[in-house]
Amino acid sequence: MNIYLVEDDEIYAEFIKKSLTQNPGYTVKHFHNAEDALAAVNGKLPDVMIVDYKLPGMSGIELYEKIKSLIREENKVILLSAIDDGNMVLSFIQKGVRDYVIKDETVIESLVAILEGKEDEFLFN
């Protein structure tokens, strides 16, 4: 599974990258900002994009808006945020975001559950 990680916090990005690449078949390419990730997309999305909401320059939701027309059933775009705000999550959903993960102690488990299509199993256990 080809994953683009868009995260400006180098340490946090390395944590996510190392954790996810322990799973066979996962490759993670890290981008420090939305502009670089958008340039890499170049009309074709990777299998998954994990995008921090708060980035320097273009925000994660702005990046989502720019790539939304490219998203197909086989693609996933997961927004990450340290902010646990119901109104913000509702605004993401209204814009079409299907997957949102809070940066907390379960972030890796949440991401893996989404990547494996087991969100419901993870959420309701």
Model-derived segments and spans:
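Conserved acidic carboxylate
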Residues: 7
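Two-component/phosphorelay signaling modules centered on CheY-like receiver
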Residues: 10-29
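Acidic, metal-coordinating helix/loop segments flanking the phosphotransfer/catalytic sites
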Residues: 30-48
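Active-site residues of response regulator receiver
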Residues: 52
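The feature encodes the CheY-like receiver
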Residues: 56, 85
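Short amphipathic alpha-helix used as the core "switch/output" element in two-component signaling
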Residues: 61-73
